[in-house]
Each structure stands twice: as structure tokens, then as C-alpha cells.
Curated annotation (Swiss-Prot):
Zn-finger segments (Phorbol-ester/DAG-type): 986-1040
Gene transcribed to yield this protein: PLEKHM1
Keywords attached to this entry: Autophagy, Cytoplasmic vesicle, Disease variant, Endosome, Lysosome, Membrane, Metal-binding, Osteopetrosis, Phosphoprotein, Protein transport, Repeat, Transport, Zinc, Zinc-finger
GO process terms (BP): autophagosome-lysosome fusion; late endosome to lysosome transport; lysosome localization; positive regulation of bone resorption; positive regulation of ruffle assembly; protein transport
Organism: Homo sapiens
Motif segment (LIR): 632-638
Listed result of changing C1021G: Disrupts interaction with Rab7 and no localization to endososmal membranes
Subcellular location: Autolysosome membrane; Endosome membrane; Late endosome membrane; Lysosome membrane
Spans annotated as Interaction with RAB7A: 654-1056
Disease implicated: Osteopetrosis, autosomal recessive 6: A rare genetic disease characterized by abnormally dense bone, due to defective resorption of immature bone. Osteopetrosis occurs in two forms: a severe autosomal recessive form occurring in utero, infancy, or childhood, and a benign autosomal dominant form occurring in adolescence or adulthood. Recessive osteopetrosis commonly manifests in early infancy with macrocephaly, feeding difficulties, evolving blindness and deafness, bone marrow failure, severe anemia, and hepatosplenomegaly. Osteopetrosis, autosomal dominant 3: A form of osteopetrosis, a rare genetic disease characterized by abnormally dense bone, due to defective resorption of immature bone. Osteopetrosis occurs in two forms: a severe autosomal recessive form occurring in utero, infancy, or childhood, and an autosomal dominant form occurring in adolescence or adulthood. OPTA3 is characterized by typical features of osteopetrosis such as fractures after minor trauma, early tooth loss, anemia, hepatosplenomegaly, and a generalized increase in bone mineral density.
Residue numbers bearing the Phosphoserine modification: S219, S432, S435, S490
Protein name as catalogued: Pleckstrin homology domain-containing family M member 1
């Protein structure tokens, strides 16, 4: 077993080192990505540093029995090297991880060790945003921590654990897409072991060792294998290459002074990086060329191997640049620069450093290869990172950089071999992917070159000769492409996409200042903040009514809707127009008037001034451009004036330049695999494979439509995994979107996002649109049926209910029906509010008593409320915890009489004495309301104030609101009704007009005036509504005298 103190740092001394690395890397990531919409990938050096620091957190303080020596015989070690320790804590991680995640990690193709699963688990947890949750669960498992860690371990320290939890909260603002399927993860690298104290920290710095020997292999932490592409970047740390070592793309990554970097395109299925002595996954006999175990090398060996490297590159055209005592650099494109996969935002260059005084042999060698050298002219620095450009003859091609459009050409996975000139030192440099994007509104991509008709200076007037994008002018590069067996891109596509060389750009920049040959295209660039978050504009406008009268209203403009309210204080919506139905936007007049025309409706509005009206119109147009189907912004294609009219033909299987300028959606549907052998969901009305457009690419998902939700599944290990779920109530509209490429494209607009989808053919897309519309219609009919339980509603109630139904309409069904708890599996372990993962080893789920659904701790904060359905059916007055969504819904409809108790459960009056008394008082109040409504004294207005504007109490005795049920549960409703009855009855007794509307008992003929609301002393005929004394009616027992007279008169009329 290995001792931590003997081989590395003291356990207590390692903790601040780990914290320093973690804090620095997270702060760097936040500073770079927090204001961008891009994701953090494994190509970022700070992300790799953060992963190493987190790995050190889990390694620090492990018991010796969980640390074993390096796996036997996988790498060949020299006599000076010691085996790296291999700590394993995979069983600990399995205790807090969901079974689906464990199954996925254990079935990865190239990750086949427990060490690899530990490292893959950490990166997958960062991708899913669950690192904080996992760590919280681990800190609660004290028994397991005691089993795996020493008392001095970082995870055993309560204060350090709290620090980690609070610090990892900063990762919630970042989105990760780290690689976790690479075979590189199968063994530990040096960095986490050194940070945790298992290895000396001095081994992290290769310059700290002697210049003749390297005691330890370099760390592979900077090796980045993006899981979403097939690009692998190898960053070597200044190590020498043995003179007998085979020269490959990876061994050509040299820099005698500092580290150099190489971006190579590898097939992730067959050419994954391995350690020295290991075999590739396809069991090839020859060790992989990316081995970093270099053994012992001296300076002379390095120089000789460098010459061999330069000889290997001798077939390519390179500009040899002699200078007068100054080291100058120029750049030429490498094949990797033009064949980088889509999504890699780096450009690769070969920097040729010329010596201060070139040797004659070198000059001769350059001449033999066809490279002519001339004295350079002093020039100003170019904006494209060219330190000092050089001059070339007409026979020599200048260097050029590759535009971002050309970087997206390559989709192949062949390993491209670079070639370079023999006479100068080479430095292969990949621009850092972590460099921040230009946030300016105008970039170099926004500039057009002068038109072809514009006369240009001759080649002799420029320090750099004109460029010809033909294969013949670049024989070396063309020969390289013709010999490459895995070519995937045409040279013509590369040449068309190339940006002018730095020298030529500088040469043309000077005259452009005087003649203004450039023109700037103003367009918003990628990576800037999204302006469509929340409300786009709000304020006060006036609307012209039917009679030409202007009424002041409060207006809100959102990315999808244009809403008008009565006032800012009283947030009652009077008009709600969907921008999807907007037909035209009128101009702004001098007095501030403007018009908005929707389908079947025209809004005549007036702002305070013309400028304010124009601002409203600009915001509306901006929202319309966002919400409507629009063609993508055209890319700027920078071409040379003297470029041939017809570029060379592209080989088969290659994207043409027109494909580069088009939306990825325009690709042919034959490239997609539409087969799916998954079993449909039990409640699915329609389920099929659709392609979803996200992150500028089409991804396959299985969509399942039911009467309740539209679910989105992704396929992992031939199993369906729920990715997202959209309730039917959140679907706003479904529209065809032929602008994406054809009739098979459509989009679904939901409350959370706009889903751009592609079906297999136009008929399939039409079927999806028809079924989604039918499900929406069924849902709306169900909502209307639920509303009818409350009887007829006034206009205000309808508007409020419409607003509440639009946001949380699915909750309306639970207003009068007790919910059935379906279980967490029916939700796919996702929160019903925010789609966050909940359940075992995730956030603890919380049950909402109102809807019977499960929510996370953010959407459910244990707000207590009575459940209306339980009061109606079970007379359960207990307050139960409900989610924030249900609380908001109950607050919105609190004062609306949506529950008709006579229709829902009339037996409640019979079985509950309190409800029987409440029912009688509600009937009394209704009868008193009839009297006060006919009185001209204004008593009805006073009664309305006492009712708190609940006028429905005077209209129907059986309509109840949520506020009524809450007061019944609190025991104050009976007193509230009693006070109203006393006030109204006192008015009737003392009002001359109301007294004249009383009754005289027709049985006893007494002169006392009686009223129908006196339930204790009077009785009323159900047929003619005549009122009698109860005692008189009980003595006579002959029924109603008035009804008897009416029947007698009718019989006489019949006989007559």
C-alpha cells in the first residue's frame, strides 16, 4: 500500500492546494461563460483544471485499502519511474447514484475500469448539474464516509464540506458538455493525484526536473475529447521525442521553448488516445502514437529528431522568412484548420519561425523546394495576429487564415497529416478555445471585399502577391489531399471559404480608408445576451372605443402576447392578443396614434408622443421577427475579386459551399435514420421519431403525445430515457414552418420554449399537427366543462378564469375532484413544475396535496392551504402543503364563484349541520338581496361594500368561491353571513318602500306584514311563492289557499 505522507503532501497541507485550484478554475469559467449562452466543453483548460480539483476532493484522505498500485502491465515503466497509485471509490458513488446512471456508466464501450467510471461519473454529474446534490447526499452518508475516508479527509471535515456545497452553487449558472466516454479516463492522471497528496507536486512542472531527463510522464489532463464530436486535442508539455520514434501527427507537436498544441481529427470509435504501451480499442498490434511516456532524451536527440520532423514536412509550401536580426512569424493553414468538425471554435496554424541569420544550407534547401525568399518590407501589424508579414513572388502562395465558415466544412474522421518545410523551426499552435468571443456588434465577418468591377493594384504594388484559389496554384496541398484516404471535403470548398491573407488584408486596408471600399453589415452576433427575457415593454397607452372615446389602459408587451389591463394597480386583463395572429403594424402619427391589426380585430392606440409610439412599434416588430418563422441571417461569404467563376467540383459526400451558407435544416432528410423499434407509451395517442433542432444541429428524439402531455425521450443503451415533458396546458400553438426546409418541418410553441421539429415526410408532419390540435381542443372542452360547474359567470370572472387557465389550466380539474396520487414513476422522476430531476439520490420529492403531483424543493415550499375538493366531498378542513404553482392558481381564482355545490355534492347540506345552516343563511341573503335591489335608497351599494365585492352571494345560494371555503374552514363564514343578514333585514323593516312589498297571511288574515326571509316564523308556497305563518299552515293543512282559488277560477273558465 502507498503512504500519502511518503509519496506526496501532508493531508492537511493538500486541502488549501485543492481549494485554490478549484476556486481559481471555477472563477475563470464564470468570468468567461456567465454572460454567454455557450456551454463549457472539455476543450476548455479551466474546465479540465476544475475536474482535476474535484477528482482530488474525492481522492483526498482515502483509506489505504482503497488505493492500489497501477494496473498491472498496461504501461511500460522505465527504471526511474514509479507506478502511479490508482484510488477507487466507485462503490461509494454507486450508493448515491440513480440506477439508470449506474447502468449507463457501466455499459460505456471504452470506459471499462472502476477508475474510469469514477472519472466519468464526475463529468456526467457536471453535465447534468447534479454535483451539488450528489455531494450533499454524500455528506449525509457519514457511515460510508467513515468506511472510505480517514478522519483528516476533506469530505470528513464538516466546515470544508459546507464550503464545497456553497461554492459549487456557483456552477448552476454554467452549462457543461464534458466528455465522459473516452478511454483516457480509465486511469488516473498526475494532476488529481498530486493535488490530493498521493504524488509530489513537483512532478506537475516538467521544468522543475533536470534538463536532460524527465522523471515522470506528462499529465494527460489537457487531452480533450469532446463527447459531441470527433475532435481530440493533445497539448504536450515541452517533452522531447526520441530520435527513433515513429513520426506521426501526435509526435509532431513540438516546441523547443514552450508547450505546443495539436488539434487532430480522430475517430472516437477506433482511434482513441491510449497510454504508452496500450493498444487501441480495435486491438491493433502497434502502440498508439500519442504516447506521452518519452523515457530519457537529451538536447542533441531532440535537435536530430526535430530535423526528422522537418524532413517529414518538406512537401508542403512554407514561406521561409530571413530577417535582419528579428524573429518573424507567418502563418499557413493546415488541413486540420479546414477540416475541423462543426462546433469546434478554434483555428489551427503553422507558425514558421525563421532564424535571425539563415544558414546557406537552409536557403539552398528552400530554393530547391520551390520556395523563393525575398527581403520583407516593414509593415504595420495585421489585425489577424500576424506579427510581421513577408513578401512573396508571384510563384509563391501567401499564407492565409481560415474563416469560421470553412471550419464547419469537415465532417470526416480521418487523421490529417501536416507537411512543412525543412529549413525553419516549426511551432504547431491551436488557438485557445477558452479565449473570449468578440462582443462587438461589428466584427471582421461583417466586412465585404471590394466588388470585382473595382480596379485593383497590380501584384507588384503589394507586399503579398494575389491569391488564386485553384488547385493548380497549390500543388503541395492538392497532392496532400489527393493522397489522403479519408478526405471528406473538397479543395474548392476550402478555397471559397478562406479569408484573405493577413498581408493582403493589410495591403488593401490602406486604400480602403480613402476610397471607403468596405461596407459594414450591422447584424447581431452569436453569443450576445438574449433580449427576449421577460417583458419587452410596459407602459400606459390609450385605446379608442366603439364610440370614438379614448380610454387609458395599462399595456404589457411580451415576446408572445400583447396585453391590455384596466390599470397598473388593478391587474385585470381586458384584452389579450397573440402576436402569432398579428397581421400588420401601422405607422406612428405625429399625435402618437398607431394601429395594430390582428385576425378579426384592430386596436387603435395612442401613446403620449410620436417617439413613444415609434418605440412601441419597434418593440412589436422585434417581437414579431422573433416569434414568426424567419429565414436565418445570411452568412457573409468573403470572396476574392479575381476568383474563378466556377469553383472545382467537390468530391462525393462533401458539403458544397452553398451548404455552408445554409441552415443545417436544409440538409436532405435522407441523412436521418427514421427507424425506431421502441415500445410506445401506454397512454400514447401518437408516438414516433422526430428530429429536434437544438444548438444548430438536428438531434433525434422520440415524441409521445397523450391527452395530458407531450413527452420527449432520448435513446440510451437502446432504452427510452425521459428528457422533457410539456403539459398540454402549456402548448400555445402548433404551426408549419416551411422556412426550415420544406413541408415536413413544423414548430410547437409552448410556455417554456419553441420546439422546431422535423418529421420523416410531409404527411407525418401534417398528422402530428392535426393530432396536437385535437388534443388541445379536447383539453379546452374539458376546462370549459369544469367551468360550467360554477354556473354562468360574469365577464370579469370569465376574463380572470381565462387568464388563470392559460397559465395553470390543468389545475382547474382538481378544483372539485380529489386528485389521485399516481406515483413518481408516472412523472419519470421529473418535477411537475420545472422538469428538474427528483427522487432517490436526487432532490427529495414533495407531494402537492392539491394536484397529487410531485415537485422539487424550489417549486414546493410547503405552503399550507385547505383543499377545496376535500372540503366538498369529505368535509376535510385540514390545511395541507401545496406547491407554489397551485398556490398561485388558488390566489388567482380566490374570489371567483366557480363551485356550484348543488351540482357537485348536494348531500353535503344534509350530512353536515354547519353546511345546512350556511345554506339557509345564503338563501336568506339572496331573498334580502332581491328586496334591496328594488329599493331606491342606495342600501344595495352599502351591502356590496360589506360583501367585499362578492355580489354572487346575492345572486345564487349555491355558488361558492375558494375564499368562501377558506372562511368556512376558519369558522368565520357563519358570522360573516349573519352580519350581512342583520344589516339587510333592518333596512327592509324600516324602509317604507320595502315594507310595501311584504305579505299578509291569507289564512289568519292578520294585519302583520311578513317576509319570505323569515324562515323561523313563515313558510312559502313552492308554486305561487305566497308567504304564510308556519302555525297557520300547520293548523289548516289544506295547502295554499291562493293556489286553490287559482285552480277554481281556471275550472270555471273551462266550463264557460
Amino acid at each position: 500500500m502507498l503512504s500519502v505522507v511518503e509519496n506526496g503532501l501532508d493531508p492537511q497541507a493538500a486541502i488549501p492546494v485543492i481549494k485554490k485550484k478549484l476556486v481559481g478554475s471555477v472563477k475563470a469559467l464564470q468570468k468567461q461563460y456567465v454572460s454567454l449562452d455557450t456551454v463549457v466543453t472539455s476543450e476548455d483548460g479551466d474546465a479540465n483544471t476544475m475536474c482535476s480539483a474535484l477528482e482530488a476532493v474525492f481522492i483526498h484522505g482515502l483509506h489505504a485499502k482503497h488505493i492500489r498500485a497501477e494496473a498491472g502491465g498496461k504501461r511500460k515503466k522505465s527504471a526511474h519511474q514509479k507506478p502511479l497509485p490508482q484510488p477507487v471509490f466507485w462503490p461509494l458513488l454507486k450508493a448515491v447514484t440513480h440506477k439508470h446512471i449506474i447502468s449507463e456508466l457501466e455499459h460505456l464501450t471504452f470506459v471499462n475500469t472502476d477508475v474510469g467510471r469514477c472519472r466519468a461519473w464526475l463529468r456526467l454529474a457536471l453535465n447534468d448539474g447534479l454535483m451539488e446534490c450528489y455531494l450533499k447526499l454524500l455528506l449525509q452518508e457519514q457511515a460510508r464516509l467513515h468506511e472510505y475516508y480517514q478522519p483528516t479527509a476533506l469530505l470528513r471535515d464538516a466546515e470544508e464540506g459546507e464550503f464545497l456545497l456553497s461554492f459549487l452553487q456557483g456552477l448552476t449558472s454554467l452549462s457543461f458538455e464534458l466528455s465522459y466516454k473516452s478511454a483516457i479516463l480509465n486511469e488516473w492522471t498526475l494532476t488529481p493525484l498530486a493535488l490530493s497528496g498521493l504524488c509530489p507536486l513537483s512532478e506537475l512542472d516538467p521544468l522543475s526536473t533536470s534538463g536532460a531527463e524527465l522523471q515522470r510522464k506528462e499529465s494527460l489532463d489537457s487531452i480533450s475529447h469532446s463527447s459531441g464530436s470527433e475532435d481530440i486535442e493533445v497539448h504536450h508539455s515541452g517533452h522531447k521525442i526520441r530520435r527513433n520514434q515513429k513520426l506521426t501527427a501526435s509526435s509532431l507537436s513540438l516546441d523547443t521553448a514552450s508547450s505546443s498544441q495539436l488539434s487532430c481529427s480522430l475517430n472516437s470509435d477506433s482511434c482513441l488516445l491510449q497510454e504508452n504501451g496500450s493498444k487501441s480499442p480495435d486491438h491493433c498490434e502497434e502502440p498508439m502514437s500519442c504516447d506521452s511516456d518519452l523515457g530519457t532524451a537529451n538536447a542533441e536527440d531532440s535537435d536530430r529528431s526535430l530535423q526528422e520532423v522537418l524532413l517529414e514536412f518538406s512537401k508542403a509550401q512554407v514561406n521561409s522568412v530571413p530577417t535582419n536580426g528579428l524573429s518573424q512569424e507567418t502563418e499557413i493553414p493546415t488541413p486540420q484548420a479546414s477540416l475541423s468538425l462543426h462546433g469546434l471554435n478554434t483555428s489551427t496554424y503553422l507558425h514558421c519561425e525563421a532564424p535571425a541569420e539563415p544558414l546557406p544550407a537552409q536557403a539552398a534547401s528552400g530554393t530547391q523546394d520551390g520556395v523563393h525568399v525575398q527581403e520583407p518590407r516593414p509593415q504595420a501589424p495585421s489585425p489577424l495576429d500576424l506579427q510581421q508579414p513577408v513578401e512573396s513572388t508571384s510563384g509563391q502562395q501567401p499564407s492565409s487564415t481560415v474563416s469560421e465558415t470553412a471550419r464547419e466544412v469537415g465532417q470526416g474522421n480521418g487523421l490529417q497529416k501536416a507537411q512543412a518545410h525543412d529549413g525553419a523551426g516549426l511551432k504547431l499552435v491551436v488557438s485557445s478555445p477558452t479565449s473570449p468571443k468578440n462582443k462587438s456588434w461589428i466584427s471582421e465577418d461583417d466586412f465585404y471585399r471590394p466588388s470585382r468591377e473595382q480596379p485593383l493594384e497590380s501584384a507588384s504594388d503589394h507586399p503579398i502577391a494575389s491569391y488564386r484559389g485553384t488547385p493548380g496554384s497549390r500543388p503541395g496541398l492538392h497532392r496532400h489531399f489527393s493522397q489522403e484516404p479519408r478526405k471528406n471535403c473538397s479543395l474548392g470548398a476550402l478555397d471559397q471559404a478562406c479569408v484573405p491573407s493577413p498581408g493582403r488584408r493589410q495591403a488593401q486596408a490602406a486604400p480602403s480608408q480613402g476610397h471607403k471600399s468596405f461596407r459594414v453589415v450591422h447584424r447581431r452576433q452569436m453569443g450576445l445576451s438574449n433580449p427576449f427575457r421577460g417583458l419587452m415593454k410596459l407602459g400606459t397607452v390609450e385605446r379608442r372605443g366603439a364610440m370614438g372615446i379614448w380610454k387609458e389602459l395599462f399595456c404589457e408587451l411580451s415576446p408572445l402576447e400583447f396585453r391590455l389591463y384596466l390599470s397598473n394597480e388593478e391587474h385585470t386583463c381586458v384584452e389579450n392578443c397573440s402576436l402569432l395572429r398579428c397581421e400588420s403594424v401601422g405607422p406612428a402619427h405625429s399625435d402618437g396614434r398607431f394601429e395594430l391589426v390582428f385576425s378579426g380585430k384592430k386596436l387603435a392606440l395612442r401613446a403620449s408622443s410620436q417617439d413613444e409610439a415609434e418605440d412601441w412599434l419597434d418593440r412589436v416588430r422585434e417581437a414579431l421577427q422573433k416569434v414568426r418563422p424567419q429565414q436565418e441571417d445570411e452568412w457573409v461569404n468573403v470572396q476574392y475579386p479575381d476568383q474563378p467563376e466556377e469553383p472545382p467540383e467537390a468530391p462525393q459526400g462533401c458539403l458544397s459551399p452553398s451548404d455552408l451558407l445554409s441552415e443545417p435544416a436544409a440538409l436532405q432528410g435522407t441523412q436521418f435514420d427514421w427507424s425506431s423499434a421502441q415500445v410506445p407509451e401506454p397512454d400514447a395517442i401518437k408516438e414516433s421519431l422526430l428530429y429536434l433542432y437544438m444548438d444548430r444541429t438536428w438531434m433525434p428524439y422520440i415524441f409521445s403525445l397523450s391527452l395530458e402531455a407531450l413527452k420527449c425521450f432520448r435513446i440510451r443503451n437502446n432504452e427510452k430515457m425521459l428528457s422533457d415533458s410539456h403539459g398540454v396546458e402549456t402548448i400555445r400553438d402548433i404551426l408549419p414552418d416551411t422556412s426550415l426546409g420544406g413541408p415536413s418541418f413544423f414548430k410547437i410553441i409552448t410556455a417554456k420554449a419553441v420546439l422546431k421539429l422535423q418529421a420523416g415526410n410531409a404527411e407525418e408532419a401534417a398528422l402530428w399537427r392535426d393530432l396536437v390540435r385535437k388534443v388541445l381542443a379536447s383539453y379546452l372542452e374539458t376546462a370549459e366543462e369544469a367551468v360550467t360547474l360554477g354556473g354562468s359567470l360574469d365577464e370579469n370572472c370569465q376574463e380572470v378564469l381565462k387568464f388563470a387557465t392559460r397559465e395553470n389550466g390543468f389545475l382547474l380539474q382538481y378544483l372539485v375532484a380529489i386528485p389521485m396520487e399516481k406515483g413518481l414513476d408516472s412523472q419519470g422522476c421529473f418535477c411537475a413544475g420545472c422538469s428538474r430531476q427528483i427522487g432517490f439520490s436526487f432532490v427529495r420529492p414533495k407531494l402537492c396535496a392539491f394536484s397529487g403531483l410531485y415537485y422539487c424543493d424550489i417549486c414546493h415550499q410547503d405552503d399550507a392551504s385547505v383543499i377545496p375538493a376535500r372540503i366538498i366531498h369529505n368535509w376535510d378542513l385540514t390545511k395541507r402543503p401545496i406547491c407554489r404553482q397551485a398556490l398561485k392558481f388558488l390566489t388567482q381564482i380566490r374570489a371567483q364563484p366557480l363551485i356550484n355545490l348543488q351540482m357537485v355534492n348536494a348531500s353535503l347540506y344534509e350530512h353536515v349541520e354547519r353546511m345546512h345552516l350556511i345554506g339557509r343563511r345564503r338563501e336568506q341573503l339572496k331573498l334580502l338581496g332581491d328586496y334591496l335591489g328594488l329599493c331606491r335608497s342606495g342600501a344595495l351599494k352599502e351591502l356590496s361594500k360589506r360583501l367585499n365585492h362578492r355580489n354572487y352571494l346575492l345572486e345564487s345560494p349555491h355558488r361558492f368561491s375558494v375564499a368562501d371555503l377558506q372562511q368556512i374552514a376558519d369558522g368565520v363564514y357563519e358570522g360573516f353571513l349573519k352580519a350581512l343578514i342583520e344589516f339587510a333585514s333592518q333596512h327592509v323593516y324600516h324602509c317604507d318602500l320595502c315594507t310595501q312589498r311584504g305579505f299578509i297571511c291569507q289564512i289568519c288574515q292578520h294585519h302583520d306584514i311578513i317576509f319570505p326571509f323569515e324562515f323561523d316564523t313563515t313558510v312559502r308556497c313552492a308554486e305561487c311563492k305566497t308567504v304564510f305563518h308556519q302555525s297557520c299552515q300547520a293548523v289548516v293543512k289544506k295547502g295554499c289557499p291562493r293556489c286553490a282559488r287559482r285552480r277554481k277560477y281556471q275550472e270555471q273558465n273551462i266550463f264557460a
